[in-house]
């Protein structure tokens, strides 16, 4: 497993958003393992589903990792959007996509946004009560999911398409294995 690092100049960037505890990404992360979630845009049915699924898992699964969202919008956009899905969500406003770009998130292809697998995932999200809304941010941006500790990226989910995301309720067990493996690699 490859362990990547978050560059210092990214960690030291000032942040603003909702329910934040610090002024830079480094301070916000501290040394605790954290799940970084980059949402596509607020109108995205899959982003709404992902936030709601993470909120449910965080409130019901023991030892769920601390979660920090990034979104392409203003502070006001975040204050309006997140309380509908998870009032306690911590989220960084990243309208210029500085953090999105730093973590290598790209724009999706036509197939990644509208392919057959995406439609099937849309049915899944709609069955959970989620629907498409007006985009806030670039609707072609792919989502991102990274498990980090301090400046180390321990794991990431490689999204195949806009509706692809892991089972958030079982994610802590997977991440615990990743963390043990990574710790052993760093010690040796």
Model-flagged regions — what are they?
Residues 1-188:
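Chalcogenol-based redox active-site neighborhoods
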């Amino acid at each position: 497993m490859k362990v990547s690092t978050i560059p210092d100049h990214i960690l030291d960037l000032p942040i603003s958003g909702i329910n934040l505890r610090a002024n830079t990404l480094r301070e916000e992360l501290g040394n605790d393992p954290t799940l970084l979630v980059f949402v596509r845009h607020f109108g995205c049915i899959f982003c709404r589903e992902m936030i709601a699924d993470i909120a449910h898992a965080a409130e019901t699964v023991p030892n769920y990792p601390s979660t920090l969202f990034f979104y392409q919008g203003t502070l006001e956009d975040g204050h309006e959007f997140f309380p509908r899905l998870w009032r306690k969500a911590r989220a960084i406003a990243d309208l210029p996509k500085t953090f999105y770009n730093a973590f290598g998130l790209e724009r999706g292809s036509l197939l990644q946004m509208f392919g057959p697998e995406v439609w099937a995932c849309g049915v899944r999200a709609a069955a959970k009560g989620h629907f498409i809304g007006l985009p806030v941010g670039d609707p072609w941006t792919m989502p991102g999911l990274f498990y980090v500790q301090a400046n180390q990226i321990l794991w990431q989910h490689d999204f195949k398409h806009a509706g692809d995301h892991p089972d958030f309720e079982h994610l802590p067990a997977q991440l615990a294995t990743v963390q043990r493996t990574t710790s052993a690699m760093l010690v040796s």
